[in-house]
Amino acid sequence: MKKIHFTDRYLLNPRHPVTVFVIGAGGTGSQVITNLARMSMALQALGHPGLHVTVFDPDTVSQANIGRQLFSETELGLNKAVSLVTRINRFFGYAWTAEPQCFPSRNFSEDSTANIIITCTDNIRSRLTLWKFLKKVRKENFSDHSAPIYWMDFGNSQTKGQVIIGTVREKVLQPSSLEYIPMPKMNVITEEVDYAKIKEKESGPSCSLAEALEKQDLFINSTLAHIGCDLLWKMFKEGKTLYRGVYVNLDTLKMTAIPV
């Protein structure tokens, strides 16, 4: 029998919008945030309260960002998180929040979390710092707007990438099934990858779009963002998933699903 993960029940029928933290508002993050805005509206059309998203990013919009990331000339010099959230709120009529800083930080206590954490960063340290923070609350079994339940991580090189969603909680309650093997736990990215063996390279900011495209090709970020958000959408809409991620290779046009 195939393994399956049933979505945490709280997310399917919450009393208020499901809280989401998006960490990083660059190439992938800007695409993910826009997809989440559409997802929230679709969920509301189905009778769900939708999403409340908080975006974290301390960086400002540069000339090299325009074209590959979802920013315009009029936003040069502005904070990325503030620019994106302001645009989303005006377009969709939301009241989402922007935080022009990193997460976690000293300004946030252990109970200042969200139901779903989405990381769209390009460095290892931020993932390890976040995991250290989340491990402090992973044994909690309460369900409210601040209870962290899932962590979805996006990562990519120039033309390859992956998205993986895992459970922050050690176990998510699963119903019995005669067709599948319910899996209460899915590994998060830091449980899949031994980052201690990976040497992180500091590439520095790009000075132009052409230089930025040498590091990350034009459509790798948006491709990953759409696939990852589709996985999340189906977890809401269908209440289950047979897959916890995917590997993408734009050179070969191949996509490999990661089963639960």
Give, region by region, the residue ranges found by the protein language model.
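Glycine-rich adenosine-cofactor-binding loop
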Residues: 18-46, 54-62
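Short helix-terminating capping/connector loops at secondary-structure junctions
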Residues: 44-51, 142-147
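Localized chelating/binding microdomains
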Residues: 1-5, 10-16, 78-82, 88, ...
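Extended hydrophobic secondary-structure segments that form protein cores and membrane-embedded regions
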Residues: 20-23, 51-60, 100, 116-119, ...
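Glycine-rich phosphate-binding loop and adjoining beta1-alpha1-beta2 segment
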Residues: 49-93
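Glycine-rich phosphate/adenylate-binding loop
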Residues: 2-28, 32, 123-260
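A structured beta-alpha segment of the ubiquitous adenosine-cofactor-binding alpha/beta core
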Residues: 76-114, 121-128
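Active-site catalytic pocket residues across diverse enzymes, especially alpha/beta-hydrolases
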Residues: 36-44, 70, 134-138
